[in-house]
Amino acid sequence: MREWFTRECDPIQKVVDGLDIGWGGVQRWATARMPPPAEGLHLDIACGYATFLAHLGWRFPTARLVGLNIDFDGPHRLARPLLIEAGVTAALVQADARRMPFADGTFGSASCFLGLQDIRIGFGEEGMRETVSEAMRVLGSGGVLALLDEFPLERFDALLDGLPLAVMDRGERGLDVRWNRRVAERAIALYTEGWVAQTRAADRTAQEQTCVEVHGQMTAEMERQLETRGYYVPFGPVRMVVARKVR
């Protein structure tokens, strides 16, 4: 599937974009560690390209999957053809994760893979809290919620504090990725563009300021890693919290 996903890319961008398929082994690790989706529907929140949905479908072929994303335009237009290429059946719903168009208790289980960080960029800390609250609302009693992101575990604890959840598992996994400077510099340019788009800022000056700040921060981290490690790992480690709704 990686070859299909990157078929129109030049050799360097093929490496960068190919990370979305599997995330350096993290998606395979996550689905192996997650409990099987409950009977009924499983919701993947902020599903983006739908690569995690594909891994869920491969790992749990009988699961009834639904992916929700704020848009399926631009890069995310590949979500539907990607699922077809993967041989995975899933319904895709375009909606804001902070205001999900589902009745209470619709889903038996839910997940969010690296989606909270994008929601934070666009809608701040409050947007993340609203998303987790909505996930709880649409999750049935006894349903399982799996959250995966780069945040420290303490930040997950703060997000879940006060909610009727019992934590079942915590885990951490680094990306099996080692990039040289040429790949890293191309990646940083692409990631900066993506970050600016996620802010949804209409003001051109604000966009340019964000671009300069984010590119500078990412470049500094790249230089640090190249000096200390000799290679660049663009993200991670990814941390996972799995919790069950207790009422």
Language-model-detected regions and their locations in the chain:
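Conserved Class I S-adenosyl-L-methionine
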Residues: 173-247
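Conserved class I S-adenosyl-L-methionine
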Residues: 38-48
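Conserved beta-strand signature within the Rossmann-like core of class I S-adenosyl-L-methionine
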Residues: 142-149
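Class I SAM-dependent methyltransferase Rossmann-like catalytic core
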Residues: 1-25
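A short glycine-rich, Lys/Arg-flanked "PGG" loop and its adjoining helix->strand segment in the class I
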Residues: 126-141
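A short acidic, Gly/Pro-enriched loop at the edge of an enzyme's catalytic core
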Residues: 98-110
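Conserved alpha-helix/loop element of class I SAM-dependent methyltransferases that forms part
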Residues: 20-39, 55
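Class I SAM-dependent methyltransferase SAM/SAH-binding core
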Residues: 49-99
